[in-house]
Every structure is written in structure tokens, then in C-alpha cells.
Amino acid sequence: MDSRMLSDQRFCRRIFAAALCVLVLLADSGCARNLWKRALHLKMTEKYDDYEYPLHSHSAHYQKNDRCPPPPQTLPDRACEVPSCRSDSECERHKRCCYNGCIYACLESVQPPPVLDWLVQPKPRWLGGNGWLLDGPEEVLQAEACSTTEDGDEPLHCPTGYECHIINPGNTAEGIPNRGQCIKLRGNPDGRNLRHKYYKEYFGSNSNNVVGYVKNQQKHLG
């Protein structure tokens, strides 16, 4: 009896050990499967990143580079066959790494558009009740902003010897003033002050009349 019981115990131990080994193998197989799936996912992600990264990088570069010409509406000939670039340092001094409609290549740079800041305070002028009639200091103006719109405040007049060339008519109904640039008057210097007075008294805040008057004067002087 004792030998039989010992034999049964050994058999049970063997079965338990075998079952434990099977469980361990199944667990290892699940871990291995999960590790394999994770490695495959990372590999595919790396491949996707390798493909997308240059596009994202170039796109961000293009947005920041204001010396690039605008992308063409139609694909130019051999646009995809020219040497590509990834930064301006790979191009000649007068060229920039820009999108040519197919790839990023070294293209001729363009000048950035001029900036007209409406919030920049104009250069100092002589102050007074009729300050706009007084001669101010002679100076060279570089795209100084001006306006002829009156909405309770004194308009942003140009210095003596300059007139306001309206570029944007604005919208008086929405409270948006017109704006322009100061250009030097041509013709008789003795009558240049009276021209500002003529604007003030006869045209007031009507920017259309001012624009028409300026055009007529330019035709007359031309």
C-alpha cells in the first residue's frame, strides 16, 4: 500500500510539474507575441516617420521663409528632376530652399513685401492750432503712414510738402479709417501748404474726393 501511495504521489507531482511548465510556456508565448507586435508597430511607426518627417520639416521651413516665391499653380517642366535641398545653407547666396511644386529645390529668392505698420507713430511735426500749415524740419520719409479720415480725432496728416496717397479706402460705415503713404508734392512749392488747406476745407473726410483730386493733379502735373 505504501509503495502504491508513493507512486501515486510521484505521478501527481509529475502532472503538476507538466501543467506548470505548460502554463509557463503559454505565458512566455503571450509575452513573446506581445513583444513581437510591439516591435512590428514600432518598426512601422519609424518607417512612417521617416517618410513624413521631411515633409513636415520642409513645410514648417517654407512657412517661415518669406524669401521664397509663391508655389506655382501648375507643375513646371522637370520640376521633380532638379536636385533637392533641405535648408538654405545648401543653396547659393542669392537662392533659397523653396517648394517648386514637386520638391524642395534651390530657387531664386524674392524680396519680402514692404511692411506698413499702421500703429507706428508718425515722425514729430510742428504742433499748434494750425500745425499742419507750418513748415517742419526737412527729412526723408520712408513709407510714412497717413489718413484723411476724420472720426472725432485729428486725421493723420502728412508733414508739410507731402500729400497722402490713399492705398486702402477703408470703410467709414464700420469705423475703419482709410490709410495711405506720404508722397512728396510736385509743382510750385509756394502753393503746397494751401493744398493741405484746400483738402481740409473743401473735401473734409470724403476720401473718394481726395483720391479723385490727387489723380487730377497728377494728370495735370504729368
From Swiss-Prot:
Cellular localization per UniProt: Secreted
Signal peptide, first to last residue: 1-32
Pfam family, one: WAP
Domain of life: Eukaryota
Gene3D superfamilies: Elafin-like (4.10.75.10)
Record-level GO cellular component terms: extracellular space
Residue ranges of domain WAP in the record: 61-110
Keywords carried by this UniProt record: Disulfide bond, Protease inhibitor, Secreted, Serine protease inhibitor, Signal
Cystine crosslinks: 68-98, 80-102, 85-97, 91-106
Biological processes per GO annotation: negative regulation of inflammatory response; negative regulation of wound healing; regulation of cell growth
Main location: secreted
GO molecular function term, any single one: serine-type endopeptidase inhibitor activity
InterPro entries for the chain: Elafin-like_sf (IPR036645), WAP_dom (IPR008197), WFDC1 (IPR042357)
Function recorded in the entry: Has growth inhibitory activity.
Protein name per UniProt: WAP four-disulfide core domain protein 1
Biological source species: Gallus gallus (Chicken)
